[in-house]
Amino acid sequence: MLFPGCRSRALSSLCFCVLVLACVVACQQEGPGGTSSPPPEPASSSWSLVPGKVKEWMEPLVTRTRESWQWFWGPRAFQGFLQTYYDDHLRDLRSHTQAWLQSSKDSLLNKAYNLCPQLLCGDSSWD
């Protein structure tokens, strides 16, 4: 269960993690070109041709998409995104956390005081 008011921070953290993961996957280089796999054996059924056809159709699409989004994966764009994310979400995290802890403490003390019978607690202040 998330704390009240933390849902937007959790969503932004999740989006950030997904973006970093996508960047890492996109930036991985292919293995060395010297090792090539042997040619596939003749297919015994038409269903065994499906993976090759899917790869044949998808490779140009993936290549075009990678080339058109190359500017996004560059270091300047990613660095700008990280700086903006820090400024928007992480810079004042400490003060937000301290304020939340203080309000939680005050709320808990008020609830405890309200549950306490007047004979036991009296009129002393809770600090």
Curated annotation (Swiss-Prot):
UniProt cross-references to InterPro entries, sorted A to Z: APOC4
GO BP terms: lipid transport; positive regulation of triglyceride storage; triglyceride homeostasis
One GO CC term on file: high-density lipoprotein particle
Keywords associated with the record: Lipid transport, Secreted, Signal, Transport
Compartment(s) of residence: Secreted
One Pfam family cited in the UniProt record for this chain: APOC4
Signal peptide (residue range): 1-27
Transmembrane region(s): none
Domain of life: Eukaryota
Family: Belongs to the apolipoprotein C4 family.
Described function: May participate in lipoprotein metabolism.
Name of this protein: Apolipoprotein C-IV
Species of the source: Physeter macrocephalus
